[in-house]
Amino acid sequence: MRTLKASGQWLDAYGLWVAQHKELVPLLYNGSFDDPFEADGFDWEFTAAPRSRAGVLLEQEAVARRGLVLDIEFTGRSFTSPIVRQYLFTPPGTYRVRGEYMASKLRSDEGLAWSVQCLSGSKAVAGRTAGLQDTGGVWKPFEFEFTVPPDCGPVASLQLEPAAALEATIGLKGHVAFDAFSLTRALPSQ
């Protein structure tokens, strides 16, 4: 699948992904972060760096009454953005992403943002959250809508990045965790 994705053969890659699962695959895979990450498919992806030089330490961590969550520790060093992403096979239309997050001692001027970006056509940002700031260790919900335009191509990227791109170069400090993600097609307004 890695080769198919790298060469832009998204339909073939996604077809192979679905065939391997032998069951209905949701629009957003592993949104609860409870399953181990599946490399090279349409699950969560991140760039691994040696622990001693990493600006981001990312793992799945067990949390009481939640199961596993996506746990991210910022070390103060620079890092590659996006921090984590999932390729979404989404036809044109409007969608809603919902999730929960908790941030503790997060030192960031503008916070973190989830965005959806087209991979072809204009490569436009289809939607983005406001900056997610420190919550003092309390879980809070977030949501945003995005619209996939017809020229977006078959795949878009849901990705986490600093709301201010410069902060990837400067580095961040603190801890953030994510859980309970869902992606649904938004109903037209009446």
Name these PLM-found stretches.
Residues M1-Q190:
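Extracellular and organelle-lumenal recognition/adhesion modules and their flexible linkers in secreted
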